[in-house]
Amino acid sequence: MNPIVINRLQRKLGYTFRQHDLLMQALTHRSASSKHNERLEFLGDSILSFVIANALYHRFPRVDEGDMSRMRATLVRGNTLAEMAREFDLGECLRLGPGELKSGGFRRESILADTVEALIGGIFLDSDIQTIERLILDWYRSRLEEISPGDKQKDPKTRLQEFLQGRHLPLPSYLVVQVRGEAHDQEFTIHCQVSGLSAPVVGVGSSRRKAEQAAAEQALKQLELE
């Protein structure tokens, strides 16, 4: 991989790896190699959840568990991580197999989000918990400053359902219209039919649940509630 691209990524992350192989593994999708990033992703997911939970606990001393859980879910969900990955220009650094390259995997939200988590796991193993906590809080500084408790933190499906129920309208229906990929790396496409919208809304995700949430989020935008 181009060392200029890798060095640019490390500058954006604010961290230079001592163990180059950990960085390469974090950037490697399972379609490209048997030494892929899924174990690092597992580790990074847990570390991210802890760091954000700890930050919210101290930032909002009077907020209850439910609101803190919703705020954490907002901050660690896939589209937030994918947004962060795009800020790092992570797509140009991914190591993908031929099939994923051909299908535009370097733009896919689920792959981008998973790679951010893998990088978190890799940085932790390359350094220590204090270093990765400092980095995560730096990456999340503006998002932590902007977030606040309240209904906005409820997941999109819940907000869409409550909106429709409040107007005595039928609940949305979700239909799986396509499933792509192997069992370990699937992509679901969902059509969501909502009263008041003339055509089904489309959502895509790495699981049925994530695709339904993505569709509900698009529906909220079309209903001008986002």
Swiss-Prot record:
* Catalytic activity, reaction form: Endonucleolytic cleavage to 5'-phosphomonoester
Any GO CC annotation of this UniProt entry? cytoplasm
Domain DRBM residues, every copy: 155-225
Q: Which Pfam families does UniProt cross-reference here?
A: dsrm, Ribonucleas_3_3
Q: Which residues form the active site?
A: D45, E117
Q: Which cofactor does it need?
A: Mg(2+)
| Keyword match RNA-binding | yes
Under InterPro entries, the record lists: dsRBD_dom (IPR014720), RNase_III (IPR011907), RNase_III_dom (IPR000999), RNase_III_sf (IPR036389)
- Compartments (UniProt record): Cytoplasm
Which class of enzymes does this protein belong to?
hydrolase
- Which keywords accompany this UniProt record? Cytoplasm, Endonuclease, Hydrolase, Magnesium, Metal-binding, mRNA processing, Nuclease, RNA-binding, rRNA processing, rRNA-binding, tRNA processing
Positions binding Mg(2+) in this chain are E41, D114, E117
EC code: 3.1.26.3
Q: Which SMART domains match?
A: DSRM, RIBOc
Q: Any coiled-coil ranges, and where?
A: none
Predominant subcellular localization, coarse grouping? cytoplasm
According to the UniProt entry, its GO molecular function terms are: double-stranded RNA binding; metal ion binding; ribonuclease III activity; rRNA binding
One record GO biological process: mRNA processing
Q: Where is the RNase III domain?
A: 6-128
UniProt keyword rRNA-binding, yes or no: yes
Self-association or partners: how does it assemble? Homodimer.
Q: Record's HAMAP family?
A: RNase_III
Q: Which family does it belong to?
A: Belongs to the ribonuclease III family.
Q: Which NCBIfam families does this entry report, sorted A to Z?
A: RNaseIII
Q: What is this protein called?
A: Ribonuclease 3
- What is the species listed in this Swiss-Prot or TrEMBL entry? Edwardsiella ictaluri (strain 93-146)
